[in-house]
């Protein structure tokens, strides 16, 4: 999906604008790691502008006008999808942030939750795959190709298993961390992410 293409669907046509006197709360989530980035409000015009431009645009309750996130700082939020909740009175926008979302220079306006680091690491690996910064170990792996990455996953998997067999907990944790990292790189080398694997696990659980 291009930056100006927003997946909306029919549910947006039945939004309940009356509950909030013409405003709907909007949760913005990182499309790659699913971290909640911020909360804002949209009126119908802000939603239309967001759909048209592909950049998250809110209605400012204090300034009483539309404002596009990042219009001053350049830290815009590129829209990937827009969904509504079951009551059609709240929006969930998945976006890709270009720079920090919080005005304090933080990634999110909310503190990190335990276990959220893996999602952030997945997003970082995806960024490394796109930008290939010089001197990065991750860049080196991508440039060596899928066979080398797969080999590293195999090596780390064996080392993790051996650490478990000998009951060396410190080694087990260290090797598990290495395995997770290289597995993320392998997934990204195939155009996949941790979210895809997690979604499959979730479908099996249901």
Curated annotation (Swiss-Prot):
Swiss-Prot/TrEMBL catalytic activity: 1-(5-phospho-beta-D-ribosyl)-ATP + H2O = 1-(5-phospho-beta-D-ribosyl)-5'-AMP + diphosphate + H(+); 1-(5-phospho-beta-D-ribosyl)-5'-AMP + H2O = 1-(5-phospho-beta-D-ribosyl)-5-[(5-phospho-beta-D-ribosylamino)methylideneamino]imidazole-4-carboxamide
Enzyme superclass (EC): hydrolase
Keywords: Amino-acid biosynthesis, ATP-binding, Cytoplasm, Histidine biosynthesis, Hydrolase, Multifunctional enzyme, Nucleotide-binding
Protein's cellular compartments: Cytoplasm
Enzyme Commission number(s): 3.5.4.19, 3.6.1.31
Pathway in which this enzyme or protein is active: Amino-acid biosynthesis; L-histidine biosynthesis; L-histidine from 5-phospho-alpha-D-ribose 1-diphosphate: step 2/9; Amino-acid biosynthesis; L-histidine biosynthesis; L-histidine from 5-phospho-alpha-D-ribose 1-diphosphate: step 3/9
Gene Ontology CC entries for this record: cytoplasm
Matches recorded under InterPro entries: His_synth_HisIE, HisE, PRib-ATP_PPHydrolase-like, PRib_AMP_CycHydrolase_dom, PRib_AMP_CycHydrolase_sf
GO molecular function, one term: phosphoribosyl-ATP diphosphatase activity
GO biological process: L-histidine biosynthetic process
Region ranges (Phosphoribosyl-AMP cyclohydrolase): 1-117
CDD domains tied to this protein: NTP-PPase_HisIE_like
Signal peptide: none
Start and end residues of each stretch annotated as Phosphoribosyl-ATP pyrophosphohydrolase: 118-206
Gene3D superfamilies per the UniProt record, alphabetical: MazG-like, Phosphoribosyl-AMP cyclohydrolase
NCBIfam families referenced in this protein's UniProt entry, alphabetically: histidine_hisI (TIGR03188), PRK00051.1 (NF000768), PRK02759.1 (NF002747)
PANTHER family in alphabetical order: HISTIDINE BIOSYNTHESIS BIFUNCTIONAL PROTEIN, HISTIDINE BIOSYNTHESIS BIFUNCTIONAL PROTEIN HISIE
Family per record: In the N-terminal section; belongs to the PRA-CH family. In the C-terminal section; belongs to the PRA-PH family.
Record-given protein name: Histidine biosynthesis bifunctional protein HisIE
